Amino acid sequence: MNKLVTDIKKLQDETLNNLNNSKSQNTFRAYKSDFEDFGLFCVKNGFKSMPTDPKIVSLYLTFLSSKNIKISTIKRRLVSIGALHKMKGHYLDTKHPVIIENFMGIKRLKGVSQTGKKPLLINDLKQIIDVINKQNEPDIKKLRNKALLLIGFAGGFRRHELISLNMEDIEFVFEGVKIIIKRSKTDQFGEGFTKGIPHFENYLYCPVKNLKNWLNMSKIKKGPVFVRFSKGSKLTDIRLTDQSVALIIKDYIKKTGINNANYSGHSLRSGFATSAAEAGAEERSIMAMTGHKSTEMVRRYIKEANLFKNNALSKIKI
């Protein structure tokens, strides 16, 4: 009997471990961060956060709306609350009418227009590369930053994908470079896929050439591709962070004389998709590079790129 109890306890522990690993660590951290805000709301108002009740969740959504929180953030918080309940073995009906009807009302009152971060378009990127070349910085640091930005743009990378690259993920071929993405936001089970980045005609802005230059000068043979510098521009073997990418982008955008307030690490990815759409690339070829599973976001980039193409007003002669 004791052995049976021990075995069941072991199975329960393994099951909980499986549940905790059903999502990526980044996703799990995001869930916990969102739930902490909900937990704080519950503590302040004398509610129980785990397990909770649909009516309490609905009140929380109204509270977020009153704080002028974006619709996309409110939706994400709702998903996080439901997901953590499920992972802890509690049932929470996030489709309950008191939640759904309230959320629909919030959307109608607030509107759902999204003002995302600005895309870093190809001409902006070229301007940044020119600025980097003129900086009074060690050559090795300039090479890293150019390779980081050009590869990030050309591959339509998410920040986490970019900083997670290791030397064993890269293969230089006649046509350019193949880069293996072992795991991504839309590939939770690590099936992986490969991005192919061809040579650019202008070597100054060629991601393949600049990546080679960086690897040759840094002499990196294994481990992280994009690493940090210590004080005195001494190379380390410590991987860059997500935040580092955003800070590098914003810093150089500012140095070009452009207002950097609406740019982020995501600007490389959205910039690639928008620039590719402007150049006439098909939806499926953009998705093949970015790894998008849904067409919704890609079509938003294409719509933005086509604002002045086939514009009805251009047919009117004034």
What role is predicted for each listed range?
Residues 1-318:
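Extended, non-catalytic subsegments within catalytic or DNA/protein-binding/adaptor domains
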